[in-house]
Amino acid sequence: MQKAAKIVTIVVLCALLALFVPYALNSDVSAAGLFFAAASLALFGVCAVLAVPRLFAALQTDEPLPPSALLGPRSMRFSRAHPWFEIVSAVLISRLLLFLLAWLINTLVNGYQGGMWNTLETLWLRSDSPSYLGIAERWYVTEGDPRFHIVFFPFYPLVIRLFSYITGGYFSSAMLVNVLCAAGTAVYFYELCALEMPRQKALRTVKYLFVLPAAFFFAAPMTESLFVLLCVSSMYYLRKKRVLASCVLAAFAGFTRSAGVLLAVPIAIEGAVALCAAYRAGEMQLFKKDLIRRVLCIFIVPLGLLGYLYVNYTVWGDALKFLEVQREHWNQSLGLFFHTAAYQFDYAVNAVKSGDMRLLFGLFVPNLAAAFLSLGVMVYGAKKLRPSYTFYFLAYFAFSIGATWLLSAPRYLAAAFPLPIALAELAKRQRMDIVLTLALLLIQVAYLGAYVLGGPVY
């Protein structure tokens, strides 16, 4: 296995090099931009190289005992007491604090414009939010400006429409959906982490999910809250060996955002680990049965994306219409993730030269910081996280950050669930935990302020 791991590592490095060399020879970015591209690729490569041996180790070793197996009878009573009420209460209080903070920031800058609840829609209905509410109200159309809404996936608007029958309005429905999804995400994420770490560490990991700089988007009428709920619940059921439930939830994640289909990566890796364990144990009947079950189930995962393509076809007569709209209306397509680092840096330099500090600190600096810092954290985490989580992050990062006109790196990366797990590993010591938590909260407050004040935060 060590020899195989070395071969795979060499193949990965050669593949990354094969991508970068022709890019470097033909790119029109600046020399400094090219350096940023190389740095991004290097961090990505280090993360992959560290994850490969862990993957092969997982394929040839049995699953370690869960933390609860190491506890005595008295401690087990505490271990089994799920802190769901405390988790949900903390999430609900944090939502109220976010709404209050957004209102205070706007009031301090723009003067009193009404109470917190009266100005809620004005402050939070920004960026892509009106598009999702428009789809919820009118579905997809082929005329006027709403025709461009075809680039947005349908599951979140469908959920908004469903809850609108309860709330009586689409905005209130979206806010309710996001609060419920945030609470559900916190509970499922805790349960997922508690499968392999002590209670307090699992709670700390949940905390880091909600203190990430762009985590306030979990409260905004956007897909993030629903998407992360589907992702972490899918992973929870996967780890509990309920593969069908995991793949169905992954399919719904793919019906919410295109990146949902990437959940096939950890599902496949965890499946391979389980199958290898059954094979080593000589349980051939179980091995064959589990192999058939997992192979059949993983084909469910892309059904969400296929459902979105079918929506494109029924509305426009073209299953790939969204690609055309993205390309022609937003100049958006899928590119190389390390090129994003290059052009974002060059755009940042141009913003400095033109004196556009609003664009510099609202868009380019957050994008670059989110991309590089997340890779740096995952380089540390790759030595400790499950390899399925690390490879999912790498696939998610390459896909999400590889946009040819990236606007939302902090928001996209806030939805990458392996990142807070790596942060919790990084902040093992209490002092580090306090410093990191406060730093992330302060950045989130600043980023929230830029969002509610109409800055280039998307």
Question: Language-model features: where?
Answer:
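Transmembrane-helix motifs of polytopic, lipid-linked glycan transferases
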Residues: R161-L162, L176-E196, L373-Y380
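Transmembrane-helix signature of polytopic, membrane-embedded enzymes
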Residues: S172-S173, G184, F189-V211, A245, ...
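Membrane-lumen/periplasm interface segments of specific transmembrane helices
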Residues: S94-N110, W124, A253, G260, ...
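Short hydrophobic/aromatic helix or loop-helix immediately within or flanking a transmembrane segment
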Residues: L123-G168, Y343-A348, S400
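Specific aromatic-rich, kink-prone transmembrane helix
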Residues: Y188-E191, Y208-V211, L226-A245, L419
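Loop-to-helix entry region of an early transmembrane alpha helix in multi-pass inner-membrane enzymes
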Residues: R147-P154, L158, I166-V187, F217, ...
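Membrane-interface alpha helices of multi-pass inner-membrane proteins
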Residues: F210, A214, V232-Y237, L244-I269, ...
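Short acidic/glycine- and proline-prone juxtamembrane loop motifs at membrane-interface regions
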Residues: A219-L226, A409
